[in-house]
From Swiss-Prot:
Role summary: Binds directly to 23S rRNA. The L1 stalk is quite mobile in the ribosome, and is involved in E site tRNA release.
Provenance organism: Prochlorococcus marinus (strain MIT 9211)
Gene Ontology MF terms: rRNA binding; structural constituent of ribosome; tRNA binding
CDD domains: Ribosomal_L1
Assembly, per entry: Part of the 50S ribosomal subunit.
Stated family: Belongs to the universal ribosomal protein uL1 family.
Name by which UniProt lists this protein: Large ribosomal subunit protein uL1
Key words, A-Z: Repressor, Ribonucleoprotein, Ribosomal protein, RNA-binding, rRNA-binding, Translation regulation, tRNA-binding
GO cellular component annotations of the record: large ribosomal subunit
Length: 234
């Protein structure tokens, strides 16, 4: 049986078992972020889909207007001049076959992998290593591209790739506890709109099941989905 710390029990006691208006939920998450570091704020979205069917899968990207507050490590697999181009653009790792070899051995010192189209036959062989970690480059998410400078710039600025897991749940970080509430709300709203725009064609019945937000060390707080969808952004 999992033992709940006094700190978590105290924080959880302040959370009611109901869906909160978006801004109120965000303020509660910020108030619950009492760790001695800048906690990450995450959204956990349960959707009415069954990802084992190809027409009920969702994998896309979102560019958060206020970023995530995190620095991501980007690796690039390319050839020749493109390797130097990637490094100049800010890639943390860049290489050809030698990088493919190191990844095949389990060396995963990065959060995102970008590849040029001509290198995909070699990258495809890494599927067993990259696939389970959600790191396989994909044209749909902009991680298979010849425009390395543009892709690196976008992902470093806060563009995120996300997908629904086997249970139909999306997990996305959308800021830090140090962000002001309005910035977090704007990011969360952008995420909601992105998910709605990418609703799978095979989704049936109620699409949004639940939405919870939480900080790294804090309790989960349910958000009123309809209220979030009703917010208009200019």
């Amino acid at each position: 049986m999992t033992k709940i710390s006094k700190r978590m029990a105290s924080l959880s006691s302040k959370i009611e078992d109901r869906a909160y208006p978006p801004l109120e939920a965000i303020n509660l998450v910020k108030e619950s972020s009492t760790a001695k570091f800048d906690e990450t704020i995450e959204a956990h979205v349960r959707l009415g889909i069954d990802p084992k069917y190809t027409d009920q899968q969702i994998r896309t990207t979102v560019t958060l207007p206020n970023g995530t507050g995190q620095t991501i490590r980007i690796a690039v697999i390319a050839r020749g001049e493109k390797v130097a181009e990637a490094k100049s653009a800010g890639a943390d790792l860049a290489g050809e076959e030698e990088l493919v070899d190191s990844i095949s051995k389990g060396e995963m010192g990065f959060d995102l992998l970008i590849a040029t189209p001509d290198m995909m036959p070699k990258v495809a062989k890494l599927g067993r290593v990259l696939g389970p970690r959600g790191l396989m480059p994909n044209p749909k998410t902009g991680t298979v591209t010849a425009d390395l400078v543009g892709a690196i710039k976008e992902f470093k600025a806060g563009k995120l790739e996300f997908r629904a897991d086997k249970a139909g749940i999306i997990h996305v970080r959308f800021g830090k506890a140090s962000f002001n509430a309005d910035a977090l709300l704007e990011n969360l709203k952008t995420l909601q709109e992105t998910i709605d725009r990418n609703k799978p064609s095979g989704a049936k019945g109620r699409f949004w099941k639940t939405l919870y937000i939480t900080s790294t060390m804090g309790p989960s707080i349910e958000v009123d989905i309809a209220a979030l969808q009703d917010i208009s952004q200019e």
